[in-house]
Amino acid sequence: MKSYAKYIPHLLVVIVFFMISIPLWLKVDVLPMRLWDESRNAVNAIEMYQTGDWLVRTYDFAPETYELKPPLLTWFQVASLNIFGLNELGIRFPSVVFSLVTLIVLFSLVYRMTRKWYIALLASFICATSAGFYTAHLGRFGDHEALLVCLYTCLFYVVYQYSSTERVRYIYLTALTVALAVLCKSISVGMLLPGIFLFLLFDKKILPLLKNKHTYLALLLGAVPVFAYYYLREQVQPGYLEMVWQMELFPRFFNTSTELVFQEDPFSYYFNLIRNSQMEYWVWSLILVILAPFIAKKLDRQWAFWSIQAALFLLIISSGTKNFWYSAPAIPMLAGAIAISVHLLINKNRKYNLTLGLPLLVMSVLSYQKAYKYAMQPAERYYEWETNGISHFLKNENHLANITSNTKVLLDDQYGFEPHKFYIEALKIERGLDIKRTELYNIKPYDTLLISHLSTLQKLKESYGIEV
């Protein structure tokens, strides 16, 4: 019996990992493509699937002028479409995998820091059950964030390993991970580098790194694929680099772009978001992160690693333009900081086991219930039905019997977004249906129209006799 006892922790880890994976994949294909930015990514992927052009993302089969990020995510999505078909699962499956990899890497890193499997499991559990990890635009959907967060977590792993061992291979792995992050979402990885630099400075590893010739070779090797991609893209799509500058780099961050204008939000935007929704229950455990070094009476290296990363990253993104998904990379950082803080407190005094155990258990149950409910009951918000109504119609087999190539899509003049475009292209490929968009002034008698806005219906009633 004793020989089997050593496998109990392994079994518990597997069981808990299966549990926390459920909110990532359960009913992942029920909701249609989301407007920002999944539906655009899906069109990029289905067009690359058709053309085989692996260099340039396209929309309406013309080079992208809005979604300007390199195509690393698109490559994964095209591969997935070839496996699962032209559907939501084909677009979202890579994100689910990336999110699971994030949890595994986070577990591995915290375990290396503490050698305690339950502390490592706590970090992954906190991350997986935080709404800022799995909800819209994040771990369950075909946006860039799942891949980006995965790459960031891998970057933390290799940086920490370098700091602990000073092995050359981790320098090269760091350069590779940064290069992949750039090919995922441009220079957003740059917002992590100050925190990494500060930790290496704290850990007295900056000078050895700067003196190592492999640092510069790794930097060169990492830069080659990045510069090669942007150079080739500019050759194929002249003006691409100028668009990237305006829409992806500093003008976007400081909200001075000539192409995009963002709503001005307060500096506290992300802190409020984490408190109110993204870590709704776990936010109370962040108190432990503040208390841990004082109670432990030491500035622990592992605590500093996570706390420096999280604090500096949140301060940097709070200084620029804001979208709710920009804070996604902070969730694994905060989860790591909380888990390490619990570890420090327990090591300081065993009486904290019960003191911390009960509130952590309550937070775990509440957070998991929220995550499971989100996955189990996917539904449109009342204000999303007009935007996504056509998508629901086109993905329903019962409705497709009434659709022909003479059916046209008529959208609202002001809110005429096209999150359904992926479905239109999929129907053209799979069924030969060529559904075009039309305008109010082009409508002819006996046209069959797909509409989803009440304002459009009202305009039709004012000018035509209609049959629904």
Q: What is each PLM-predicted segment?
A:
Residues 10-15, 106-130:
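Transmembrane-helix signature of polytopic, membrane-embedded enzymes
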Residues 320-350:
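Hydrophobic/aromatic-rich transmembrane helices and adjacent perimembrane loops
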Residues 343-373:
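Signature aromatic-anchored transmembrane alpha helix within multi-pass, membrane-resident enzymes
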Residues 22-27, 41-65, 72-75, 79, ...:
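Extracytosolic helix-loop segments that constitute the early lumenal/periplasmic catalytic or substrate-binding loops
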Residues 41-47, 180, 189-299, 309-320:
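Transmembrane-lumen/periplasm boundary regions of multi-pass, lipid-linked membrane glycan transferases
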Residues 114, 153-173, 295-296, 342:
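Membrane-interface transmembrane helices that cradle and orient dolichyl/undecaprenyl
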Residues 372-460, 464-468:
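Short periplasmic/luminal acceptor-recognition loop of GT-C membrane glycosyltransferases, typified by
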Residues 93-117, 154:
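Transmembrane-helix motifs of polytopic, lipid-linked glycan transferases
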